[in-house]
Swiss-Prot record:
GO terms for cellular component: cytoplasm. This is Holliday junction resolvase RecU. Endonuclease that resolves Holliday junction intermediates in genetic recombination. Cleaves mobile four-strand junctions by introducing symmetrical nicks in paired strands. Promotes annealing of linear ssDNA with homologous dsDNA. Required for DNA repair, homologous recombination and chromosome segregation. Binds 1 Mg(2+) ion per subunit. Keywords: Cytoplasm, DNA damage, DNA recombination, DNA repair, Endonuclease, Hydrolase, Magnesium, Metal-binding, Nuclease. It catalyses: Endonucleolytic cleavage at a junction such as a reciprocal single-stranded crossover between two homologous DNA duplexes (Holliday junction). Its cofactor is Mg(2+). One of its GO terms (molecular function) is magnesium ion binding. The gene is recU. InterPro entries: Resolv_RecU, Restrct_endonuc-II-like, tRNA_endonuc-like_dom_sf. GO terms for biological process: chromosome segregation; DNA recombination; DNA repair. Its EC number is 3.1.21.10. The record marks 99 as: Transition state stabilizer.
Amino acid sequence: MNYPNGQQKVTTNHVVQKQDNRMFSNRGMSLEDDINATNEFYLETNQAVIHKKPTPVQIVNVHYPKRSAAVITEAYFKQASTTDYNGIYKGKYIDFEAKETKNKTSFPLANIHEHQINHMQKVIDQQGICFMLIRFTAHDETYLLDAKALLTFWNLKQDGGKKSIPYDMIRNQSQLIPFHYQKRVDYLAAVDKLYF
């Protein structure tokens, strides 16, 4: 096409192909979404009863136009006091935290709060099954790390040690959880290997 000043529009057909080196498993889903879908499958197939604990909310302001139509106009999330998930599996109490990291070389212990560590220790003291699911999004891998191992890394950090768990250590001391269509994060298979 010729424009009034006599110049032609130059078109360039640059097609940028984004190389997608992710495995089929992630497909944009978060770890929490994957765990929730897996827990729903476990519940429907009578394998386990495990639920996500709701995040506590502090309600600040409520508008009451009439008694039956109260509307919360201001609220804030409180910091959760324990771990993300709990329930029962094969007659045993199960309790775990789930975290994702974009870090390729380590899992930062700053992602865990001291109150969560204290809660995990109490679960262990009562002979419950306790662990952390860690997803390395850069590797598209999810691992189950036993809480006792996590507590060891945490205590080393408290004594001036490393502030993160190296990826290679997690690979060596954890169970890799494969992706399945219905059981996206089939962590009970890893629980069976570690605890039963």
